[in-house]
């Protein structure tokens, strides 16, 4: 029996489902092509992927910009990991540097000029005028010091109201109304100075500087390995530390060799990171507070060092110092106090981190100064205080500089924290008051710089809040008067004396009924008034009250007001020149009837007069029988009638003037026609009222449209 032939391993019984490529070509010929794949089912064609789109020039530029931004971000993170100060990246020379404007990255300037530049950047914004109202903190840096006795263990409480101009919460300077909030103006700003800080001031006697000098003479240096460990330790501080290591202790004890100019420049440059751009005066105030807190921290660290020296001896002393940690309650207290003072200007969060970072910077600077085996290039060129650090002995003797020169920042290079400086209670109080004053200036600057239009909901919410606050303020003041009643212009009260009396239920119901009727009548009359007209009427009403009270344009109270319309109620329209002068001269010598209003207008005026008589009589009857009605209702009706009467008169006068101009042209023709027919003319003069007779009369075309009138 024959064996069935076997299929090759690369063949597939169903080529439409699976396809295996043939085995590698055994032919070494380079130009050999493998056989094409078998045909597939037309329903199973695969879609060939489209080629990638060609990028345009704009897309390429955007990709390059994103790449550059990523590179810049990487460099920034690298510089932060290396603990590089961003202010040292833009070195101007050995004594100064340039900083970048936070509002325009193309502007570079010295740190001392950044504050004034920020008030003019951009060019459309100019806030220099705000410095005129807040400038007292610039003059309180050198206050006199008064020597006092030790205050004991209690804290000092000092008032700050006399040390700075905090302004007043006035919307209007000359009005004692509810536009001024008493809880804000009545708030007294005080400073509480803890005992651990007050004893470090120069005002008090009993300072223990001799003890600290003894400890500083025995201070140990910091090894390079300890410096790295100390940096890692303080980088982990996210809150006020409850304890620190011996390396931090040594850095705090040796912090008096840190240069003042370096710390001042750091405060001035890095204040922008915490949201506020400060000037050199504010920098000096902040540095004074920091230096006071540092003195208490150094005093506590010296106490820890003296305790370790008394308990341990020799090698055990060194090993115990390297491995032990020290609880620091005073360090926490002074940090909290400094953060609370900086929170006035920077806010609670930024003030806390700013105070903590200042101490971190000081500790790092001190450790780099007291570090053993330093290179010559890392030593300060203008220090002159620490001469020999390799032998772990810090010489705290008075070192006389030849001539301390001033750098570009205005500070004296060579002065360290060990240099004598008067830190009095008055200067500390002035520094805290400067923070309050500077915060008010910062609020005004931000209100102008970051001004944004409020939404309708925000405006309504702010209006409701201010209204509720004003109501609360009015309830606290029994002698509150509206603004219009101030300045000697009391408003005219209602003439109805019944308003001050207790009213019965019937009177109240009658008033409510009258109010509804008046509202319905106003709704029908004033429906065509625009909001502008309503506001105009309100302003006129208040203006009348002010004039009656002796206000604008009146030298005495109660002077009669001039009518708002050019025509008085008891004056004729001819007195104001509404008639044509030339026509009057021509008709003055003729014996004829003067021109009057047209018949329909005259009838309307008669109706108005009859209505006036009826209303006056009815108002008298109502006043005699119903005394509970308000007089303002009659005043409103009379005012409306006067306005309507005035408008009708103006319209009639305009029609009359226009008619006179037409009749004046044909008057000469009329005279010639009268001379030709003298008999008819005499008849017209003898019977001037024949126009009202019921008998028909033949008149010419001119007489049909000419109506003689009586003399006014």
UniProtKB/Swiss-Prot annotation:
UniProt signal peptide: none
Compartments reported by the entry: Nucleus
GO molecular function: zinc ion binding
Xref: InterPro entries: TRM13/UPF0224_CHHC_Znf_dom, UPF0224_FAM112_RNA_Proc
Disordered: annotated segments: 562-712
Pfam families: zf-U11-48K (PF05253)
First and last residues of each zinc finger (CHHC U11-48K-type): 98-125
GO cellular component labels: spliceosomal complex
The entry's keywords: Metal-binding, mRNA processing, mRNA splicing, Nucleus, Ribonucleoprotein, Spliceosome, Zinc, Zinc-finger
Top-level taxon: Eukaryota
Binding site for Zn(2+): 101, 107, 117, 121
Primary role: Likely involved in U12-type 5' splice site recognition.
Record note on domains: The CHHC region interacts with the 5' splice site of the U12-type intron.
The protein's assembly and partners: Component of the U11/U12 snRNPs that are part of the U12-type spliceosome. Not found in the major spliceosome.
Protein name: U11/U12 small nuclear ribonucleoprotein 48 kDa protein
Organism of derivation: Arabidopsis thaliana (Mouse-ear cress)
Gene: SNRNP48
């Amino acid at each position: 029996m024959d064996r069935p032939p076997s299929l090759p391993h690369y063949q597939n019984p169903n080529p439409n489902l699976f396809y295996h490529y043939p085995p590698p070509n055994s032919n070494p010929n380079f130009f050999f092509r493998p056989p094409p794949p078998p045909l597939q089912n037309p329903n199973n064609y695969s879609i060939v992927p489209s080629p990638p789109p060609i990028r345009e020039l704009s897309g390429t530029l955007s990709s390059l910009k994103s790449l550059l931004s990523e590179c810049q971000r990487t460099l920034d993170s690298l510089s932060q990991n290396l603990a590089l100060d961003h202010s040292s990246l833009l070195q101007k020379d050995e004594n100064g540097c340039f900083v970048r404007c936070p509002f325009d990255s193309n502007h570079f300037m010295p740190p001392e000029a950044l504050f004034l530049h920020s008030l003019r950047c951009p060019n459309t914004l100019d806030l220099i005028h705000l410095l005129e109202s807040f400038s007292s903190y610039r003059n309180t840096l050198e206050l006199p010091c008064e020597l006092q006795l030790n205050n004991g263990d209690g804290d000092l409480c000092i008032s700050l109201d006399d040390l700075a101009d905090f302004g007043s919460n006035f919307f209007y300077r000359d009005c004692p109304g509810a536009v001024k909030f008493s809880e804000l103006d009545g708030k007294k700003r005080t400073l509480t100075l803890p005992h651990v800080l007050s004893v470090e001031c120069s005002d008090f006697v009993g300072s223990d500087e001799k003890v600290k000098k003894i400890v500083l003479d025995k201070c140990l240096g910091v090894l390079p390995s300890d410096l790295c460990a100390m940096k890692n330790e303080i980088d982990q501080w996210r809150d006020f530390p409850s304890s620190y290591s011996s390396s931090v202790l040594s850095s705090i004890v040796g912090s008096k060799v840190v240069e003042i100019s370096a710390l001042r420049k750091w405060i001035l440059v890095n204040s922008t990171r915490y949201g506020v751009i400060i000037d050199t005066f504010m920098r000096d105030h902040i540095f004074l507070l920091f230096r006071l807190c540092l003195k208490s921290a150094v005093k506590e660290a010296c106490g820890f060092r003296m305790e370790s020296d008394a308990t341990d001896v020799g090698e055990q002393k060194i090993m115990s110092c390297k491995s032990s940690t020290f609880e620091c309650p005073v360090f926490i207290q002074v940090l909290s106090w400094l953060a609370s003072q900086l929170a006035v200007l920077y806010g609670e969060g930024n003030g806390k981190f700013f105070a903590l970072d200042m101490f971190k910077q000081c500790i790092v600077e001190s450790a780099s100064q007291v570090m053993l085996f330093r290179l010559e290039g890392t030593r300060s060129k203008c220090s002159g205080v620490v001469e020999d650090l390799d032998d772990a002995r810090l010489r705290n003797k008075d070192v006389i500089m030849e001539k301390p020169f001033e750098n570009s920042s205005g500070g004296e290079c060579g002065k360290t924290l060990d240099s004598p400086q008067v830190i009095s209670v008055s200067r500390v109080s002035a520094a805290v008051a400067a923070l309050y004053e500077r915060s008010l200036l910062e609020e005004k600057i931000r209100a102008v710089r970051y001004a944004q239009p409020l939404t309708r909901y925000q405006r309504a919410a702010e209006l409701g809040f201010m209204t509720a606050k004003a109501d609360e303020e009015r309830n606290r003041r029994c002698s509150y008067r509206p603004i219009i009643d101030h300045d000697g212009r009391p408003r005219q009260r209602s003439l109805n004396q019944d308003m001050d009396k207790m009213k019965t239920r019937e009177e109240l119901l009658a008033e409510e009924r009258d109010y509804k009727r008046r509202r319905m009548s106003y709704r029908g009359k004033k429906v065509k008034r625009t909001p502008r007209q309503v506001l105009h009427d309100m302003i006129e009403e208040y203006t009348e009250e002010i004039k009656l009270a002796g206000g604008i344009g009146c030298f005495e109270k109660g002077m009669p007001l001039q009518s708002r319309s050019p025509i008085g109620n008891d004056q004729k329209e001819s007195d104001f020149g509404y008639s044509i002068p030339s026509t009057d001269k021509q008709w003055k010598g003729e014996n004829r009837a003067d021109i009057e209003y047209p018949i329909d207008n005259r009838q309307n005026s008669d109706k108005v007069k009859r209505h006036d008589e009826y209303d006056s009589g009815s108002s008298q009857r109502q006043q005699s029988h119903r005394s509970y009605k308000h007089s303002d209702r009659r005043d409103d009706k009379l005012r409306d009638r006067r306005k309507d009467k005035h408008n009708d008169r103006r319209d009639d006068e305009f029609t009359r003037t226009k008619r006179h101009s037409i009749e004046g042209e044909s008057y000469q023709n009329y005279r010639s026609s009268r001379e030709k027919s003298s008999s008819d003319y005499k008849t017209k003069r003898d019977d001037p009222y024949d126009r009202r007779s019921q008998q028909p009369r033949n008149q010419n075309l001119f007489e049909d449209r000419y109506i003689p009138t009586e003399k006014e």
